[in-house]
Amino acid sequence: MLSGPGADSQLGDPDFRRPLAPTVVCEAPAGSDDPYWSFYDEVASVQLREWLPGAPSRVLDVSGQRDRFARQMVAAGHQVIRVIGELDQLGKIPMDPANRESHPPPAGRLTAATAATWRTAGPGIAGGRGGALRSVVGDARSLDWFAPTSFDAVLAEGRALSFCLATESTLEEIHRLLRPGGQLLLCVDSLLLGLARLAEQHRWAELSDVPRADVVLVPAEDGTITRCFWPEELKAVLTSARLEVDWIRPRTVLSAEAVKRALAADMSSFPTLVRTEVELAAEREGESIGIHLIASARRPG
């Protein structure tokens, strides 16, 4: 147990106060106009574009509340089923102008089956070449309500699997949903981010346990808990779910400060910075750099 200036306030040090707001940022704050997060989003978009199947495919999107990934896939001509965790989020999805006969969901709980037929984005949404978007209400942590081998690909962007504390179980469900040869792209919190957040919260006991821990969980001020991974652990978790790992790499390598300085000096460098970042991330495959890791895996067959 620690005491003195570095101790946790709950251990009795009256002079210690936790920070009012976290300084270690896990993702773009709502409404952020920070150029770094615009850069980050564009890097994620390029990485997704390079990963997507070339032929039109049926894709399950469990990337949380942000719909930018689903719309990008629709624009590329894919049939996308997007899982929404809360019923009220369905009303926030923009309606396709070509589908004006759609109606809001009925009051009460909407099942996955009925939600799947309620809101469909027809051909041409977001410039899609025959792509379509359907949104369903359900728990992305437990996907047993989909039929086996229903999808050609699964996207778990936006740190989605870091919020699934029993990640192994969720990945086993994803394996079941993928057709043989189907692929998975995921993004999770890195161990580097987890260590930084634990240090910021002065959780020294948890930090000292990390080398011996099988799973590293990090609490947030709002009560949520996320799981972070190092590359070897992520590979082991994917392999245990009978998925073949194509690669594991950092989402970003360049520091936020370096990106901001470069953009402040010359905004026209934005495309070059994005391409450089994507190439650097691929070169640093297997390394735990930056706040997030991305991984590509597939069901054998």
List the model feature ranges, each with a label.
Residues 2-57, 68-75, 183-213, 259:
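Conserved class I S-adenosyl-L-methionine
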Residues 60, 66-143:
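Class I SAM-dependent methyltransferase SAM/SAH-binding core
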Residues 141-154:
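A short acidic, Gly/Pro-enriched loop at the edge of an enzyme's catalytic core
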Residues 152-166:
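A short SAM/SAH-binding and catalytic strip from SAM-dependent methyltransferases
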Residues 168-183:
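A short glycine-rich, Lys/Arg-flanked "PGG" loop and its adjoining helix->strand segment in the class I
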Residues 223-242, 248:
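Short alpha-helix
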Residues 236, 246-301:
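A C-terminal cap/extension of S-adenosyl-L-methionine-dependent methyltransferases
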